Amino acid sequence: MTTDEGAKNNGESPTATVAEQGEDITSKKDRGVLKIVKRVGNGEETPMIGDKVYVHYKGKLSNGKKFDSSHDRNEPFVFSLGKGQVIKAWDIGVATMKKGEICHLLCKPEYAYGSAGSLPKIPSNATLFFEIELLDFKGEDLFEDGGIIRRTKRKGEGYSNPNEGATVEIHLEGRCGGRMFDCRDVAFTVGEGEDHVIPIGIDKALEKMQREEQCILYLGPRYGFGEAGKPKFGIEPNAELIYEVTLKSFEKAKESWEMDTKEKLEQAAIVKEKGTVYFKGGKYMQAVIQYGKIVSWLEMEYGLSEKESKASESFLLAAFLNLAMCYSKLREYTKAVECCDKALGLDSANGKGLYRRGEAQLLMNEFESAKGDFEKVLEVNPQNKAARLQISMCQKKAKEHNERDRRIYANMFKKFAEQDAKEEANKAMGKKTSEGVTNEKGTDSQAMEEEKPEGHV
């Protein structure tokens, strides 16, 4: 049944109509959640697990008494589907809806608030009636930058996720512009998907998946094949990609606390080399993952021997300097400055750290700070020609920036002056008009007084 017109015609309450004619949408078929579509939605697509959904709703007890309504608050209710943020009946019911659909749900207590209720409005063991309108839904933004949107087709098992360095076995299907360009089973190490022609967005998303999870990933160019594209697959530069990924199995990599100092130092040497290979290949996000491992393993390592301490400091210094370079390439200049700060905390006179921090600050238009760093480079190495050129660049950019500001402010002041002059002119015109009207009234009055005697008998 797709409407409740029958209920209107025979006088039945919507609750009674759903109880008699509603479709059982529970997996157990225990009539715990019954549904009637009041208004058919658009298209065939329905929300998936993890989607952010936007709804309007009215909630009533079985006796017809209203206990809640989003309409009364004049704003939609928003939640993530299938995450336990709402009652079970809603996670079940909204998952069956299409955009624009309005439906009625009748929910037994075990799919609502159960024996506890939700006092004072909802008593114990209450059967609830809802009218729900699905306004919109969209996938889960994994990193809140729009670069990776996940839509979960099948929920995974358990709560464990692969970590960086985990060995995973997945099935993937890649599409671009409606064309499938990749379909295979593949095993690889998370963070090293590039070695298997897998974009970095897959590595990132896998760290948020569970075993046997199946999802659709929408990757922006930054998390796809970027500006280079992928000629092997016929992918143009800056293409948006869609991947369907199933995580079949995984084995987690050792966590930092599971490794002794010797192992950490050995692994640091390995990942440093991997990071350098990625950097030289222009794979800066992949390089960040490798250099970041060194920081996670060694930054908080204590109780080292003198030899271990020197080795650890050397790896950390290289990692921070290389991370700064990667972040600058990724145009994440604030992070680049932070990494340089860490490097300079280990070696305050490090020329590379000072130079790279200066570069990042110059790109952030922090001209004085950048100039100061390049001057410090010259204190360390007076023969550094690049630093001298950068000081000249800072001075030039600062001058251009100041001149541009002066022009902007001059134009602003000119506009303000013109506006003030216009307002003064309007006031003067208004005053003149007012005086003219007064004079005309005086003349008319005088004329009437002169004519008045002639009108008398």
From Swiss-Prot:
The modification N-acetylmethionine is found at residue 1. It comes from the Eukaryota. GO terms for biological process: chaperone-mediated protein folding. One of its GO terms (molecular function) is peptidyl-prolyl cis-trans isomerase activity. Residues 50-138, 165-251 form the PPIase FKBP-type domain. It catalyses: [protein]-peptidylproline (omega=180) = [protein]-peptidylproline (omega=0). It is found in: Cytoplasm; Nucleus. Keywords: Acetylation, Chaperone, Cytoplasm, Isomerase, Nucleus, Phosphoprotein, Repeat, Rotamase, TPR repeat. Its EC number is 5.2.1.8. SUPFAM superfamilies: FKBP-like, TPR-like. Its main location: cytoplasm. It holds the Pfam family FKBP_C. InterPro entries: FKBP4/5/8-like, PPIase_dom_sf, PPIase_FKBP_dom, TPR-like_helical_dom_sf, TPR_rpt. It is an enzyme of class 5 (isomerase). The modification Phosphoserine is found at residues 13, 445. Part of a heteromultimeric cytoplasmic complex with HSP90AA1, HSPA1A/HSPA1B and steroid receptors. Upon ligand binding dissociates from the complex and FKBP4 takes its place. Interacts with functionally mature heterooligomeric progesterone receptor complexes along with HSP90 and TEBP. Interacts with IFI44L; this interaction modulates the kinase activity of IKBKB and IKBKE. Interacts with IKBKB and IKBKE. Immunophilin protein with PPIase and co-chaperone activities. Component of unligated steroid receptors heterocomplexes through interaction with heat-shock protein 90 (HSP90). Plays a role in the intracellular trafficking of heterooligomeric forms of steroid hormone receptors maintaining the complex into the cytoplasm when unliganded. Acts as a regulator of Akt/AKT1 activity by promoting the interaction between Akt/AKT1 and PHLPP1, thereby enhancing dephosphorylation and subsequent activation of Akt/AKT1. This is Peptidyl-prolyl cis-trans isomerase FKBP5. The gene is FKBP5.
